């Protein structure tokens, strides 16, 4: 799911606090972002896990990644990746390819040609609570 952050979405994201690492990102000309996501789990049923890629339209960038944003516009489209593991427990790493269709019109952003690329904030597995930034240049 890719969505714009809003008050309703902010409430829904409160449970999306589990860690996820991004590997092998690929952005195509037809605006599909494919990533290999790694996360901790115990069930082989990956449908237990939910992922949400969010454009934070809030001026103050409030939320889990607020402190990771640059102080001024750096020319990139910034997105936030969230993970919810449901009732699954963290036992071993699992991997899944996930594909997101990104539409500037849907997000209410500038066209991709006006950006240098995309930066995705995420909390990777196997680390402290630090945020990492994945950069995809156009």
Regions found by a protein language model. Give the residues of each.
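Transition segment at domain starts
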Residues: 1-23
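Short helix-loop boundary/capping segments
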Residues: 21-86
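Generic structural detector for well-ordered beta-strands
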Residues: 26, 99-103, 137
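Intrinsic-disorder/low-complexity, polar/charged segments enriched in Ser/Thr/Lys/Arg/Asp/Glu/Gln
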Residues: 32-34, 97-99, 133
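Short loop/turn segments at connectors of secondary-structure elements within structured domains
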Residues: 45-47, 114, 130
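Short, solvent-exposed, Trp/other aromatic-anchored flexible loops in extracytoplasmic proteins
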Residues: 82-124
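Short beta-strand elements
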Residues: 126-138
């Amino acid at each position: 799911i890719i969505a714009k952050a809003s008050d309703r979405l902010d409430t829904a994201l409160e449970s999306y606090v589990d860690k996820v690492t991004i590997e092998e990102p690929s952005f195509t000309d037809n605006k599909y972002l494919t990533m290999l996501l790694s996360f901790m789990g115990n069930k082989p049923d990956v449908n237990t896990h939910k992922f949400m890629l969010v454009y934070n339209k809030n001026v103050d960038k409030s939320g889990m990644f607020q402190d990771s944003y640059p102080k001024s516009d750096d020319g990139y489209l910034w997105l936030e990746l969230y993970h919810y593991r449901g009732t699954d427990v963290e036992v071993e790493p699992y991997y899944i390819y996930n594909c997101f269709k990104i539409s500037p019109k849907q997000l209410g952003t500038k066209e991709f040609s006006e950006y240098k690329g995309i930066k995705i904030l995420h909390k990777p597995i196997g680390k402290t609570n630090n945020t990492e930034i994945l950069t995809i240049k156009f």
